[in-house]
Amino acid sequence: MTTIFAIETSCDESAAAIVRGRTVVASIIASQIDVHRLTGGVVPEVASREHLQALGGVIAACFAEGGLGWADIDAVAFTCAPGLVGSLLMGSMAAKTLALVHARPLVGIHHLEGHIYSAFLSDPALEPPFLCLLVSGGHTSLVAVEDHGRYRILGRTRDDAVGEAYDKVARVLGLGYPGGPAIDKLAQRGDPRAFALPGGRVESPFDTSFSGLKTAVLRLAEKHRLQRLPIDRADLAASFQRTVVETLAERVELALAHTGYDTVVVAGGVSANRGLRERLGQAGPYRAVFPPMHFCTDNAAMIACAGVARFERGFRSSLDLPVQSRLSLEACDSLYQCLPVP
């Protein structure tokens, strides 16, 4: 069974993992949240420096946890796009050095493909085709996963990603960073119908827009402040979350009807949201698959799992593979020097 060692450094987590097949052998994550909380968001230069300081220890701890050596590893996978260039470079240099020193093949992985494969860690029997709702701080997309490595983007956000909207609303409510978990927790105590807020609907049936919703929350909070009226933050958080969740659920149900698929994978950092899990996890005509909670946010286990799928199908990357801040999920094959023969 294929065993992959992987590194993930696309943003503010320094992570390494070993996955055998679809089973996690070891996974280590060094988070930078406490560092970036001081500035209310990720500072790219700071993130790069933190990766540089953490990666050596993270890699050593990963092999120690797994009880394996390089003789057990078939290939090295790493996140090469998209993400913060400086952060990606830290992981790229480490992965390429290890692949070269230990004479192992290299497999570059698209970060969002990694998130899709995080669902395989909770359901090893999962197979395409299925629909994937990718929801994170930087991405909100509906993707038809037609086969392993074959993706068709059905819809995306026109402006703010879901996670970005959560962070901005959290700042308005004085909840700090990161905003997603803070709003999710506060919303459990509030009335989700206390405030009528505009949904994220646009003309395209599968696209979303959350800038109007974010602005509505900002204006509502400002109006109460100017009029010196009390505002229940829990009610506002619950109303905001309900609006987001219903908008996403509507898009998912439309896309499932359009594709004829009966399974939706929900992946990305926002897939940990309790409101979203409850809404999409309700009994219905479709099955919802979520990653394990500890693999919803950025981690290397998902990169390794995607690496297994790519490696077993003959994909290999060059040591010259550059990192890229932006790359469409539909362009994944551009990351590979050796492509399998059809």
Swiss-Prot record:
Quote the subcellular location field of this record.
Cytoplasm
In this record, what's one Pfam family?
TsaD
User: Which of UniProt's keywords are assigned here?
Assistant: Acyltransferase, Cytoplasm, Iron, Metal-binding, Transferase, tRNA processing
| Enzyme Commission (EC) number | 2.3.1.234
Binding residue positions for substrate: 134-138, 167, 180, 184, 273
Cofactor(s) demanded: Fe(2+)
GO cellular-component terms in the record? cytoplasm
Catalytic activity reads: L-threonylcarbamoyladenylate + adenosine(37) in tRNA = N(6)-L-threonylcarbamoyladenosine(37) in tRNA + AMP + H(+)
Which GO molecular function, any one, fits this protein according to its record?
Answer: iron ion binding
The record ties this protein, via SUPFAM superfamilies, to:
Actin-like ATPase domain
Chief location bin: cytoplasm
Q: How is the cofactor bound?
A: Binds 1 Fe(2+) ion per subunit.
| InterPro entries given in the database record | ATPase_NBD, Gcp-like_dom, KAE1/TsaD, TsaD
Chain residues that bind Fe cation: 111, 115, 298
Q: Give the transmembrane ranges.
A: none
Q: Which GO terms describe its biological process?
A: tRNA threonylcarbamoyladenosine modification
Is Iron one of the keywords?
yes
Biological function: Required for the formation of a threonylcarbamoyl group on adenosine at position 37 (t(6)A37) in tRNAs that read codons beginning with adenine. Is involved in the transfer of the threonylcarbamoyl moiety of threonylcarbamoyl-AMP (TC-AMP) to the N6 group of A37, together with TsaE and TsaB. TsaD likely plays a direct catalytic role in this reaction.
Q: Which family does it belong to?
A: Belongs to the KAE1 / TsaD family.
HAMAP family linked? TsaD
The protein's name: tRNA N6-adenosine threonylcarbamoyltransferase
Q: What organism does this protein naturally occur in?
A: Gloeobacter violaceus (strain ATCC 29082 / PCC 7421)
